[in-house]
């Protein structure tokens, strides 16, 4: 039963990921659909050893993500995923999801470095891993993908209407829900191999 709930959750995450990659906006109803399978998994797992550690860690992570400027969808997704039981008391579910997402984000960072090394913008080494050099036209056409300037909260970001110069250095708006979907797929694979505690 937990495997079926996990696959249902992954299907919803897949659709949310599609929306996140395409527009960087996820419909509220899609995020709401993450909770029925997660709550059912929580109900079935409540008595598992140290189960409560996963939801607690998930809520702490969700709060930390929101306080550091991540979008509401990212925070709510990690909160929902944390309701799934850990396959090991030593590895709460959100830790596995974040680890898997981190591997995916590392791949994105390497991709950004390779792209930026061939583009004309002057960037620090750190920026080459976290930002992207794009043409003015691309930045204006797909403003949902690129964050220009200092932004503390992505929910309140308003793209500029004009950009000076032919190229601009922008923070790449990482679709973190898509990375979490890959992290949750890793969790499901490990859960299938190891099984419940």
Q: How does the language model describe each region?
A:
Residues 1-197:
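A membrane-topology feature that recognizes alpha-helical transmembrane segments
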């Amino acid at each position: 039963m937990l495997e079926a709930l996990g696959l249902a959750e992954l299907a919803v995450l897949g659709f949310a990921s599609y929306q996140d990659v395409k527009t960087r906006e996820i419909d509220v109803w899609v995020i709401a659909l993450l909770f029925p399978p997660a709550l059912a998994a929580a109900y079935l797992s409540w008595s598992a050893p140290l189960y409560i550690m996963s939801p607690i860690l998930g809520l702490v992570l969700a709060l930390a993500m929101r306080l550091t400027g991540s979008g509401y969808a990212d925070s709510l997704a990690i909160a929902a995923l944390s309701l799934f039981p850990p396959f090991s008391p030593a590895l709460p579910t959100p830790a596995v999801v974040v680890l898997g997402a981190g591997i995916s984000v590392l791949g994105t960072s390497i991709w950004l470095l390779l792209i930026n090394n061939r583009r004309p913008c002057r960037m620090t080494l750190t920026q080459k891993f976290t930002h992207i050099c794009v043409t003015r036209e691309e930045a204006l056409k797909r403003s949902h993908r690129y964050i220009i300037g200092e932004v503390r909260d992505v929910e309140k970001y308003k793209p500029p209407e004009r950009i000076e110069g032919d190229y601009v250095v922008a923070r790449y708006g990482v679709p973190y829900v898509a990375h979490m979907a890959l992290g949750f797929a890793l969790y499901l694979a490990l859960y299938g191999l190891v099984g419940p505690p």
